[in-house]
């Protein structure tokens, strides 16, 4: 069978209509190739994806790159397949775009192993439902917001509170401690941030264990609506074929929904609540259901969630919440205290913070830590107005321990050594639980609270206190 060639009949921004011969219509979601001289000199440089069959042998497609320079009558090749993504070792350490082409200037990527980006979620019979904690080495997360392997965590926070640094630290720890692979999907993010992340990962030495797939703000909506699927396809290969525990970061999941809404409007669908696409729940569901543990390996997702106008009832974040196993909330108030990572220990939550999953000791320590911090928060107004002297003896002890806990929740990161000047620390889960248990039990009431700031394990805090005593 020869190549199936069609021709462009209409171009409306990112929407391109293509006419084929009778009986040769490509299927929905098929990738078609066009040579667009505006992009570069290469042949077949523009990929468009079939979205609708209009009748009269015409298909309506959504472009994955700019359509400036296209004219009616141009030839269009039918690939016969969905968008195909290169997978495996070839993509590690590389930056790809939505259609799997490199954008880092380091030459071509091997096309030996390719997978379609549209795939079904694993069957129920293949899924692994046992809950195992993913140790991240970050104290505040492991203690209070434990990540389930194969789970989905949302990271909420404004600009400049440290979402990217926590992400990079987790990429580093998964690579160094577990030998795991990380995939980063930049969905509708700032090009500058994507560039910064690439260089920081390169300098931090974590790039060889990571694959980056970018569809930035400047890309047409078609690319932004597909880039998360392209990255997920890469992660699925490592899970299913190589039996790896993979970490996928999606920054920002809201932009995926936003791009879907733009595509929906371009295709002439009637909008739903707040102008979103009527298929919002199913679009997000198709992506999220592919992120899971199977009997071969797991994909754990960390998704940054932008909340439009801080309205958590907006359909986009509200639909996302339904899929999440937990939320890591980063707080500007904690940044102001100089405590990093700036995770809010009272606002953050995890589905597996439960004695059935973690054991009684871990659960008990985590809840006691939260109770002490909550009590300290309630007493802060009294302290501000009347001072510490007016508190009861019991409250004074609680406040002193809470302040130590607050500082002990900070931690020097490997990827932030340049800013902090302190070597990074990876803290094992049992050491984290033991350290906080000793503080809440009052074993370290005699140590100054400064000794607990920016340390790894509790032993380091004790050494700090000794050094301070000697210096005094």
Curated annotation (Swiss-Prot):
The keyword Aminoacyl-tRNA synthetase does not apply. Its main location: membrane. InterPro entries: AAA+_ATPase, ATP-synt_VA_C, ATP_synth_F1_bsu, ATPase_a/bsu_AS, ATPase_alpha/beta_chains, ATPase_F1/V1/A1_a/bsu_N, ATPase_F1/V1/A1_a/bsu_N_sf, ATPase_F1/V1/A1_a/bsu_nucl-bd. The keyword Cell inner membrane applies. It is found in: Cell inner membrane. PROSITE patterns: ATPASE_ALPHA_BETA. Keywords: ATP synthesis, ATP-binding, Cell inner membrane, Cell membrane, CF(1), Hydrogen ion transport, Ion transport, Membrane, Nucleotide-binding, Translocase, Transport. It is a peripheral membrane protein. It holds the Pfam family ATP-synt_ab. It catalyses: ATP + H2O + 4 H(+)(in) = ADP + phosphate + 5 H(+)(out). GO terms for cellular component: plasma membrane; proton-transporting ATP synthase complex. ATP binds at residues 157-164. It is an enzyme of class 7 (translocase). Its EC number is 7.1.2.2. Belongs to the ATPase alpha/beta chains family. F-type ATPases have 2 components, CF(1) - the catalytic core - and CF(0) - the membrane proton channel. CF(1) has five subunits: alpha(3), beta(3), gamma(1), delta(1), epsilon(1). CF(0) has three main subunits: a(1), b(2) and c(9-12). The alpha and beta chains form an alternating ring which encloses part of the gamma chain. CF(1) is attached to CF(0) by a central stalk formed by the gamma and epsilon chains, while a peripheral stalk is formed by the delta and b chains. Produces ATP from ADP in the presence of a proton gradient across the membrane. The catalytic sites are hosted primarily by the beta subunits. This is ATP synthase subunit beta. It comes from Desulfatibacillum aliphaticivorans. The gene is atpD.
């Amino acid at each position: 069978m020869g190549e199936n060639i069609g021709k462009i009949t209409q171009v409306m921004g990112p929407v391109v209509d293509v006419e084929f011969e009778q009986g040769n219509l490509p299927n929905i979601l098929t990738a078609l190739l066009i040579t667009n001289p505006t992009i570069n000199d290469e042949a077949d440089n523009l990929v468009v994806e079939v979205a609708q069959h209009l009748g009269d042998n015409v298909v309506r497609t959504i472009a994955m790159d700019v359509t400036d320079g296209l004219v009616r009558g141009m030839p269009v090749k039918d690939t016969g397949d969905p968008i195909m993504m290169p997978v495996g070792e070839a993509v590690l350490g590389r930056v790809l775009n939505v259609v799997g082409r490199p954008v880092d200037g380091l030459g071509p990527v091997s096309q030996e192993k390719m997978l379609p980006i549209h795939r079904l979620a694993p069957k129920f019979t293949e899924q692994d439902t046992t809950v195992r904690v993913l140790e991240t080495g970050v104290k505040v997360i492991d203690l209070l917001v434990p990540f389930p392997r194969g789970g989905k965590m949302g990271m909420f926070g404004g600009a400049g509170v440290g979402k990217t640094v926590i992400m990079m630290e987790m990429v580093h720890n998964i690579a160094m401690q577990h030998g795991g692979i990380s995939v980063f999907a930049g969905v509708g993010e700032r090009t500058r941030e994507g560039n910064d992340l690439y260089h920081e990962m390169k300098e931090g030495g974590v790039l060889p264990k990571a694959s980056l797939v970018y569809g930035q703000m400047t890309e047409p909506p078609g690319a932004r609506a597909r880039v998360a699927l392209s990255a997920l396809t890469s992660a699925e290969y490592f899970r299913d074929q190589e039996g790896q525990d993979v970490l996928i970061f999606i920054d920002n999941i809201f932009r995926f929904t936003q791009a879907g809404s733009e595509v929906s409007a371009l295709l002439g669908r009637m909008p739903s609540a707040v102008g979103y696409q009527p298929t919002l729940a199913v679009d997000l569901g198709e992506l999220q259901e592919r992120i899971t543990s199977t009997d071969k390996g797991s994909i754990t997702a960390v998704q940054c969630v932008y909340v439009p106008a801080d309205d958590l009832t907006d359909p986009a974040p509200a639909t996302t919440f339904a899929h999440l196993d937990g939320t890591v909330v980063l707080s500007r108030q904690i940044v102001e205290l100089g405590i990093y990572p700036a995770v809010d220990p009272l606002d953050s939550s995890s589905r597996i913070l439960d004695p059935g999953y973690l054991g009684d000791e871990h659960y008990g320590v985590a809840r006691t830590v939260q109770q002490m911090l909550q009590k300290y928060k309630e007493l802060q107004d009294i302290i501000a107005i009347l001072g510490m002297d007016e508190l009861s003896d019991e409250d004074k002890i609680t406040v002193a321990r809470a302040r130590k806990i607050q500082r002990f929740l900070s931690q020097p990161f490997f990827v932030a050594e340049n800013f902090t000047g302190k070597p990074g620390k990876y803290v094992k889960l049992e050491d984290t639980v033991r350290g906080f248990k000793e503080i809440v039990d009052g074993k370290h009431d005699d140590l100054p609270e400064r000794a607990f700031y920016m340390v790894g394990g509790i032993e380091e805090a004790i050494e700090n206190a000794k050094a301070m005593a000697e210096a005094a």
